[in-house]
Structure formats: structure tokens, C-alpha cells
Amino acid sequence: MSKIVIIYYSSTGTVDAMARRASQAAEKLGAEVRLRHVTETAPQEAIEQQDAWVAHRREVEQEPVASLDDLEWADVVLMGSPTRYGSVTSQLQSFIDTTGPLWGAGKLADKVYAGFTASQTKHGGQESTLLSLYTTFHHFGGIVVAPGYTDPVKFADGNPYGVGKVTGETSELDQDDNAALDHLVARVLMVSDKLTS
């Protein structure tokens, strides 16, 4: 079974919940899993303006932080980020910007990649956020495995590019969110296993 790393940024916890669900799905399928958040780079005064952001920072501060070793180790890379004006957060982008040495050595190529995101509003930049991630993955020489509409659950979340969660008033994942994440994980692992067998 493949080795999968789930690398994400979450300010208030929604993308964190998505990452944890993806991690659980991968473990159930027998994959080796690393779950890693990226370093927080926002100024403390910005974080302190939202109680949920402060609380989430406390929840994850002792958990492992993503490293280049995690990327090199993995056969499958899932990345997650909230939308920020139709793109990934600066925190995740800062991590991506450190990958040059691995990229230059060809160590990011030929891995399976996919993404997930969340926004407060419907169509709040989810597709463009995923596509911006995928542009990076193409530069890596990665194999992007989007879910498309390969399972009926994709008609519930409506996002063929990855998994997108609309938070609205709540950041809790619902049955459709969980099913979409489970399907994405099963799909990337299935493709990776075919490529490595």
C-alpha cells in the first residue's frame, strides 16, 4: 500500500477537520499516513482577532509540522488550504516555496497529487484554489488525480477538481463532505497502487 502525506493549513479548524478525515480514510485502507500542518506565519495580532483562530492554533501547536522529508517520503501527496481570494493561503504557499531543492533533484515528480479546500461561501474561490495547487503539482512533474464525477457523491459536493467544503455558519463536516473525502482518498491510493505495482 502507498505512503500518503496530508499537508494542510487551517486557521479556524475546517481544513484541519478535512485533513483528519482524509487521514482516517487512508488508514482504514491500509496506507502509511503522515498528517502535517504547515507553520503559521500570520502575525499574532491578526490571529487574536478571531477566537476560533486562537483556539485552533492551541489545538495543533504540539502536532508535527510539514517538512521536505515528508514530501520525499510520500507516494501520494494531498494538500489542503482554505481559499484566500481564490488561491491558497500564504502559509501553505510559504511551505510550497521551500520545495525548490526537492524539485531540482526531481524528487517531487511521479507522485500522485490531489487537493481539498474550504470557503465560507458557495463558489468562494474553491475551484481556482484547487487549480492553483494543481499548477504547482504540474510544475513538480506530479500526477494530478482529480475525483471528476467518478462516484455519485461528487454530484453532492459538485467539485470535480478535488473536495470543497462550504462552511457557512458551521465548520463541521457533514455526511457528503466525509463521503467526498473518503472517495478522493480511495481514488488517489488506487491510482498510486496501480502506478507502483
Label every PLM stretch briefly.
Residues 1-105, 166-197:
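N-terminal beta1-alpha1-beta2 submodule of the flavodoxin-like/Rossmannoid cofactor-binding fold
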Residues 8-9, 85, 95, 113-116, ...:
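Aromatic side chains
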Residues 34-45, 148-161:
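Short connector loops at secondary-structure junctions
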Residues 49-50, 94, 101, 119-122, ...:
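Short amphipathic alpha-helical patches
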Residues 108, 161-164:
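Short clusters of hydrophobic/aromatic residues that line enzyme substrate/ligand-binding pockets
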Residues 118-122, 163-172:
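Phosphate-binding/catalytic loops
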Residues 138-159, 167-180, 188:
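A charged, well-structured terminal subsegment
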